Amino acid sequence: MALTKMKDLRQLSDQEVSDRIAAIKKELFDLRFKKATRQEVKPHQFKHLRHELAQLLTLENERRRSGGQG
């Protein structure tokens, strides 16, 4: 699974961004739960999900700031 590019995320609507943020937070919770219960977890999934979450939160913040000034 390759890391997501910002140009791909910029094409999403505001609602899709919010939905994806919620989904990633749930996936991260599930991964942490699996790790805590000693189930098999691929460590790179944490990195990929945190990276995409940071990108989405940045995008959401950029849109919020630009919308408030215009």
From Swiss-Prot:
GO biological process: translation
The keyword Hydrolase belongs to this UniProt entry's keyword annotation: no
MF annotations from Gene Ontology: structural constituent of ribosome
Entry keyword set: Ribonucleoprotein, Ribosomal protein
Entry annotated with the keyword Membrane: no
Record InterPro entries: Ribosomal_protein_uL29 (IPR050063), Ribosomal_uL29 (IPR001854), Ribosomal_uL29_CS (IPR018254), Ribosomal_uL29_sf (IPR036049)
Cellular component GO terms, alphabetical: cytosolic large ribosomal subunit
HAMAP family: Ribosomal_uL29 (MF_00374)
Family note: Belongs to the universal ribosomal protein uL29 family.
Stated name of the protein: Large ribosomal subunit protein uL29
Annotated organism of origin: Thermosynechococcus vestitus (strain NIES-2133 / IAM M-273 / BP-1)
Gene that this sequence comes from: rpmC
